[in-house]
Amino acid sequence: SYFVPGVRLQYLQKPSRQLGFILGHQGEGSLLSYLKNQGWATSLYAGIRSETKEYDYAQISIELTEKGLEEYQEILGVTHSYIKLMKKAGFQEHVFDELKTMASLEEVYSNKGEGARRAENIANELNMYNFKDAGRINYAYGDPKPENFDSLLSYFTLENMLVLLSAKGLKTDKEEYHYKTKYSYFENDSLYLALLRDKPSHTFELPKPNSFIPKKVKIPNREIKDNIKPRLLINNKNTKIYFAKDHEFLRPKGVISYKILFPKNKMSAQHRAFLKIYIECVRESMNEVAFPARLAGLSYSLFD
């Protein structure tokens, strides 16, 4: 984690969201993709937590494998290699534009909540933001300011870094007073800093323009009707395909669902176990492709 100046008042540019977007990206060439290929990590989260108007803290959280735990110093070096690439590349205008586009779509079509929770959210935001933007802070965007992004990223340095390593079996030499939690604390010496700084360059890529982001959204004119039944398009020995047009919610989205039926005598307990393993393998192998689609509001699910 890194302590950074408060970015709450930069909500129209959202440099913290851009930074978390790039660091936490899971597509091809990303930091997480590299860590997975090395067998070091299974997931990664990056973002900035707003504490006060004066300061926030940025966090990169990586879930390690057993192999990754052994190589955690190497992972720190790799992470800072990626941060160096971000600093060299600077502000990514297409990332800002994509976040702005998706925010505008979410503002129009997402569920905003209602009742007491909605009122409480607006009241809280009235204490911190302009009246006209209260209730829509997550969706509000102004003109980009690259200097805000670059300034925020400049605080991602080794000298400003706090590393927390949490796992079973770690050696500790201290005990917390109130809860008796075992822990250790030490500050990096020059050798440790040299280990982090002197890393070879890795094959990283910053997020490319996302082809899944819609350029425009259009809903065909439809009258709200009751008792609309799905229409059977294909009906043969092996396949049945239905189609149903939405006449109620009028959202720019659709759902395609496939159900594959196996003969009961072909699905033993062993086959079901293999199927679950296969599903997890498909999900993992599809992640680099599916992640950009998820950012655009698309998704898929695979289950037995």
Residue ranges and their predicted role:
Residues S1-D304:
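Mature, solvent-exposed C-terminal subdomains and processed small-chain segments of exported/organellar
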